[in-house]
Amino acid sequence: MRSIIKRRRPGILQGAGYALRYVRALFLGVGCKIFLGEFPRPGVLLRNGLAHEAERLAQLLQAGCRVPEVWWQEQNLLVLEYVGPDLAHLIRKEDSTSRLWLTRAAAADMAAFHARGLWHGGAQIRNLTLQDGEIWRIDFEENIGATLSRPLAQAYDLFQMLASLVSLRKLDDGDARTLGKLALEVYLESNPDPEVKACLMRLARVLCAIAMPLRPLLRRFPSRDVQGFFRVADILQPLISKS
């Protein structure tokens, strides 16, 4: 049977590494407070890693979610059930019809997941897989959702999925925007939670305000991340217009 082996090697400069990660988490928290109104506590953000992932997987399995089983666990090592190829790989290689189906399935599954009051925390499209015609979720090391309100944690999940989807390699600009718009539409139709939408609108205002002055300078910059940022800002912009 196939499995996924995840290892973390303890660093020689572990104390210094923790200090740097704490400073980074602190800056993230301050930025989140300024722009989105919530302060994710750095100490909670840093309670992540393989042990945290094993705990979350056990909780989600108990709740009946489609996530991998933990087959073996020891310090700095997890052996997980293999739950199919990731959607990033599938979307890159499939035809347009299959891409649309996969995008709809991913958005609808996230909406159903959120409707149960759950959050992922690492909801990039590469962390969704397809097995037996159903969407599964992997990679639960990140702990940001534990220190945000439920609506903001879920809005952040959706942002992660959209941003990663529209930044995929082998998608031209038109296809990327089509898939991103479809994912947003399907999600909001399936989970019309006003609190999540309000958080998404706040996030959209921040992204659009940042994108406006940068666009003339970086419009032709050949970076998937930069162009993906502009695409997701454009996809979310109508939320502001309707508010």
Could you tell me what each predicted segment is?
Residues 12, 87, 145-147:
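Conserved protein kinase catalytic core
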Residues 69-73:
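Short beta-strand
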Residues 8, 83, 141:
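Anionic group-transfer/hydrolysis microenvironments
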Residues 1-48:
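ATP-binding glycine-rich loop module of kinase domains
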Residues 50-66, 88-126, 131, 135, ...:
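Conserved kinase catalytic-core helix
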